[in-house]
Amino acid sequence: DPFSIINVEIKSPKSGEKDIVRKTIACVKAHHLFDRLIISSFDPRLLVEAKEIDPNTRTGFLYSPDSPVIEQVYDDPIAYAKQIHADALHPLIAYVDEDYLDDCHKSGIIVNPWTVNLEEAMRLCSEWGSDGIITDTPDVAVSVIR
């Protein structure tokens, strides 16, 4: 689908791994898919690095109760997204409701909750205006959205 977004999650690199963000961006650009890319990570440093490599890189911050920076994010997710220059927040679905989505959208922040596998949660995300979802069951998502 030429309109699909490609969400590439980058994990925190193991010691000795270098330039994973730079290599990812270069690979996506080489395949002429950069305009469809969003890089997501639980590690905000990798998202900042992506913006330093190319300020046009779209980034999404993944977070859950286990996130090392959860206190900062939980208190004010929009302020945290702006602090790290993230284009999107990718929260655990339990954090998302209609007010959360409205507040993010008013601030220009995209929201793609995860892991949205239940049909009812997919319907709610759609009704509330979620920009997208991260799911393990894309076939179910397609049938629910149609």
What is each stretch, according to the model?
Residues 1-146:
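Short loop-to-alpha-helix "cap/lid" segments that border enzyme active sites
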